[in-house]
Amino acid sequence: MITIQPEIEILSTESYEDMLRRIEKIGRVCYKSEERIGEGTAEKFIAGIIKRGHESVIEHGSITVKVTCDRGVTHEIVRHRIASYSQESTRYCNYSKDKFGNQITCIDLATGFSYDLNDENDRKKYEVWQKAMEAAEQYYFQMLELGAKPEEARSILPNS
Protein backbone atom coordinates (compact mmCIF):
# COMPACT_ATOMS: atom_id res chain seq x y z
CA MET A 1 0.00 0.00 0.00
CA ILE A 2 1.21 3.49 -0.75
CA THR A 3 -0.04 6.80 0.55
CA ILE A 4 0.00 9.98 -1.48
CA GLN A 5 -0.61 13.65 -0.81
CA PRO A 6 -3.79 15.34 -2.04
CA GLU A 7 -3.15 17.78 -4.86
CA ILE A 8 -4.77 19.94 -7.51
CA GLU A 9 -3.54 20.41 -11.07
CA ILE A 10 -5.13 22.95 -13.41
CA LEU A 11 -4.94 21.89 -17.05
CA SER A 12 -5.52 24.36 -19.88
CA THR A 13 -5.29 24.24 -23.66
CA GLU A 14 -3.89 26.56 -26.25
CA SER A 15 -4.63 24.60 -29.41
CA TYR A 16 -7.08 22.04 -30.77
CA GLU A 17 -4.43 19.32 -30.47
CA ASP A 18 -3.76 20.29 -26.85
CA MET A 19 -7.48 20.10 -26.12
CA LEU A 20 -7.68 16.59 -27.62
CA ARG A 21 -4.66 15.47 -25.59
CA ARG A 22 -6.23 16.84 -22.41
CA ILE A 23 -9.54 15.08 -23.06
CA GLU A 24 -7.61 11.86 -23.58
CA LYS A 25 -5.51 12.38 -20.42
CA ILE A 26 -8.58 12.88 -18.23
CA GLY A 27 -10.65 10.24 -20.00
CA ARG A 28 -7.97 7.63 -19.47
CA VAL A 29 -8.10 8.30 -15.70
CA CYS A 30 -11.47 6.51 -15.71
CA TYR A 31 -9.92 3.37 -17.17
CA LYS A 32 -6.49 3.79 -15.54
CA SER A 33 -4.89 3.57 -18.97
CA GLU A 34 -2.72 6.69 -18.90
CA GLU A 35 0.29 4.63 -19.99
CA ARG A 36 -1.34 4.23 -23.43
CA ILE A 37 -1.12 7.95 -24.17
CA GLY A 38 1.18 8.59 -27.10
CA GLU A 39 1.64 10.67 -30.20
CA GLY A 40 -1.60 10.59 -32.18
CA THR A 41 -3.62 8.48 -29.70
CA ALA A 42 -6.06 11.19 -28.60
CA GLU A 43 -8.43 11.19 -31.59
CA LYS A 44 -8.78 7.40 -31.60
CA PHE A 45 -9.38 7.32 -27.84
CA ILE A 46 -12.00 10.08 -28.04
CA ALA A 47 -13.78 8.33 -30.92
CA GLY A 48 -13.89 5.19 -28.77
CA ILE A 49 -15.40 6.90 -25.74
CA ILE A 50 -18.02 8.56 -27.92
CA LYS A 51 -18.86 5.19 -29.47
CA ARG A 52 -19.26 3.72 -25.96
CA GLY A 53 -21.53 6.59 -24.90
CA HIS A 54 -19.08 8.08 -22.40
CA GLU A 55 -19.66 11.62 -23.69
CA SER A 56 -19.17 13.37 -20.34
CA VAL A 57 -15.41 13.12 -20.90
CA ILE A 58 -15.79 15.47 -23.89
CA GLU A 59 -16.87 18.20 -21.48
CA HIS A 60 -13.25 18.49 -20.37
CA GLY A 61 -12.64 20.47 -23.56
CA SER A 62 -13.19 23.71 -21.62
CA ILE A 63 -11.19 23.80 -18.39
CA THR A 64 -10.11 20.89 -16.31
CA VAL A 65 -8.93 20.67 -12.74
CA LYS A 66 -7.40 17.33 -11.76
CA VAL A 67 -8.03 16.77 -8.05
CA THR A 68 -6.26 13.98 -6.20
CA CYS A 69 -8.20 13.53 -3.00
CA ASP A 70 -10.07 11.12 -0.81
CA ARG A 71 -12.84 9.19 -2.59
CA GLY A 72 -15.30 10.36 0.04
CA VAL A 73 -14.63 13.94 -1.05
CA THR A 74 -15.28 13.10 -4.70
CA HIS A 75 -18.59 11.51 -3.76
CA GLU A 76 -19.62 14.84 -2.27
CA ILE A 77 -18.56 17.07 -5.18
CA VAL A 78 -19.89 14.92 -8.03
CA ARG A 79 -23.41 15.18 -6.60
CA HIS A 80 -23.44 18.88 -7.42
CA ARG A 81 -22.98 18.88 -11.18
CA ILE A 82 -21.74 22.36 -11.93
CA ALA A 83 -18.92 20.84 -13.92
CA SER A 84 -17.83 17.57 -15.53
CA TYR A 85 -16.23 14.87 -13.41
CA SER A 86 -14.22 11.81 -14.34
CA GLN A 87 -12.61 9.63 -11.72
CA GLU A 88 -10.65 6.41 -11.59
CA SER A 89 -13.19 3.60 -11.84
CA THR A 90 -12.90 0.99 -9.11
CA ARG A 91 -15.40 -0.97 -11.17
CA TYR A 92 -13.01 -1.46 -14.07
CA CYS A 93 -9.58 -0.99 -12.47
CA ASN A 94 -8.10 -4.21 -11.09
CA TYR A 95 -5.43 -3.20 -8.58
CA SER A 96 -3.84 -6.64 -8.64
CA LYS A 97 -2.45 -5.87 -12.10
CA ASP A 98 1.14 -4.75 -12.62
CA LYS A 99 0.19 -1.30 -13.93
CA PHE A 100 -1.00 -0.46 -10.41
CA GLY A 101 2.12 -1.90 -8.80
CA ASN A 102 -0.10 -4.61 -7.30
CA GLN A 103 -1.21 -2.25 -4.56
CA ILE A 104 -3.97 0.19 -3.73
CA THR A 105 -3.34 3.91 -3.26
CA CYS A 106 -4.73 5.82 -0.29
CA ILE A 107 -4.74 9.55 0.38
CA ASP A 108 -2.55 10.18 3.43
CA LEU A 109 -4.77 10.76 6.48
CA ALA A 110 -2.10 12.68 8.38
CA THR A 111 -2.04 15.41 5.75
CA GLY A 112 -5.80 15.78 5.51
CA PHE A 113 -6.25 16.15 9.25
CA SER A 114 -2.94 17.90 10.00
CA TYR A 115 -1.77 15.15 12.32
CA ASP A 116 1.42 15.81 14.23
CA LEU A 117 3.15 12.44 14.07
CA ASN A 118 5.45 13.55 16.90
CA ASP A 119 2.36 13.69 19.12
CA GLU A 120 1.74 10.26 20.68
CA ASN A 121 -2.06 10.35 20.31
CA ASP A 122 -1.94 11.53 16.68
CA ARG A 123 0.69 8.90 15.89
CA LYS A 124 -1.45 6.15 17.44
CA LYS A 125 -4.52 7.26 15.44
CA TYR A 126 -2.41 7.28 12.29
CA GLU A 127 -1.05 3.79 13.00
CA VAL A 128 -4.59 2.42 13.48
CA TRP A 129 -5.65 4.04 10.18
CA GLN A 130 -2.60 2.61 8.40
CA LYS A 131 -3.34 -0.92 9.68
CA ALA A 132 -6.96 -0.58 8.53
CA MET A 133 -5.82 0.47 5.03
CA GLU A 134 -3.38 -2.44 4.85
CA ALA A 135 -6.14 -4.85 5.94
CA ALA A 136 -8.48 -3.43 3.29
CA GLU A 137 -5.78 -3.97 0.67
CA GLN A 138 -5.21 -7.55 1.85
CA TYR A 139 -8.91 -8.45 1.76
CA TYR A 140 -9.43 -6.71 -1.61
CA PHE A 141 -6.71 -8.89 -3.18
CA GLN A 142 -8.10 -11.97 -1.43
CA MET A 143 -11.51 -11.33 -3.02
CA LEU A 144 -9.86 -11.10 -6.46
CA GLU A 145 -7.93 -14.33 -5.83
CA LEU A 146 -11.26 -16.01 -5.04
CA GLY A 147 -12.53 -14.97 -8.48
CA ALA A 148 -14.42 -11.80 -7.59
CA LYS A 149 -14.62 -9.13 -10.29
CA PRO A 150 -13.07 -5.75 -9.46
CA GLU A 151 -16.58 -4.29 -9.20
CA GLU A 152 -17.35 -6.82 -6.43
CA ALA A 153 -14.05 -6.48 -4.56
CA ARG A 154 -14.21 -2.67 -4.62
CA SER A 155 -16.76 -2.64 -1.80
CA ILE A 156 -13.81 -3.34 0.53
CA LEU A 157 -11.78 -0.32 -0.63
CA PRO A 158 -11.65 2.81 1.56
CA ASN A 159 -14.09 5.49 0.39
CA SER A 160 -13.51 8.38 2.72
Give the role of each language-model region:
Residues 1-160:
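Family-specific signature for flavin-dependent thymidylate synthase
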